[in-house]
């Protein structure tokens, strides 16, 4: 039992399958439209003229999106507590599934926000697919290797899982942040291009 163990989540019955589908897939995908309204209408220029910096803008987007997933997940927690009290489940198993849902929601939401910073719909889809592929390619081998070292989901595994969540959440937000620049000098490479390259080579 461990965080980011997707197989554990989707093999734990219909409740966790539905919770994972809603909180890790459907709600985070709403982030694909979040940055577009700021960039296409020029609102980001007004925001950057205030005391807000680029990190504040993208973090606010993520907290809003992730907060909706958390609120939705919390609303169904009484069912989990009821299952635990009647003795049908183990608390560590439920905690691992909950951590997978919340951590996965943060990573997918950050990737969706990063992809939404591109104006073209095809580019958004392509960037999001690249982000998901990089996330799977970067997280899965590290998690499997750490689980193999400790012969299970121990402390090393969970430290690796927390690092993976933090890494890919920050990469998604950095991608969105890179598109909020007011100007780029003619000899500079676009920061978003460098971050896309980072996604390619990150695994």
Model-derived segments and spans:
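Glycine/proline-centered hinge or cleavage motifs at structural transition points of membrane proteins
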Residues: 50-51
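Hydrophobic alpha-helical transmembrane segments of membrane proteins
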Residues: 1-43, 54-203
């Amino acid at each position: 039992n461990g965080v980011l163990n997707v197989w554990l989540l989707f093999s734990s019955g219909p409740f966790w399958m539905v919770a994972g589908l809603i909180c890790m897939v459907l709600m985070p995908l709403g982030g694909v439209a979040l940055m577009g309204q700021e960039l296409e209408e020029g609102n980001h220029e007004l925001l950057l003229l205030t005391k807000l910096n680029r990190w504040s803008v993208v973090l606010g987007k993520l907290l809003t999106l992730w907060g909706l997933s958390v609120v939705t997940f919390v609303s169904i927690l009484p069912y989990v507590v009821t299952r635990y009290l009647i003795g049908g489940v183990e608390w560590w198993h439920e905690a691992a599934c909950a951590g997978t849902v919340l951590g996965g929601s943060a990573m997918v939401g950050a990737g969706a926000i990063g992809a939404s910073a591109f104006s073209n719909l095809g580019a958004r889809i392509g960037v999001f697919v690249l982000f998901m592929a990089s996330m799977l390619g970067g997280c899965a081998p590290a998690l499997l290797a750490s689980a193999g070292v400790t012969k299970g989901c121990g402390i090393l595994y969970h430290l690796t899982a927390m690092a993976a969540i933090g890494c890919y959440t920050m990469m998604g937000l950095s991608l969105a942040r890179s598109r909020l620049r007011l100007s780029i000098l003619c000899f500079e490479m676009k920061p978003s291009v460098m971050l896309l390259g980072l996604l390619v080579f990150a695994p």
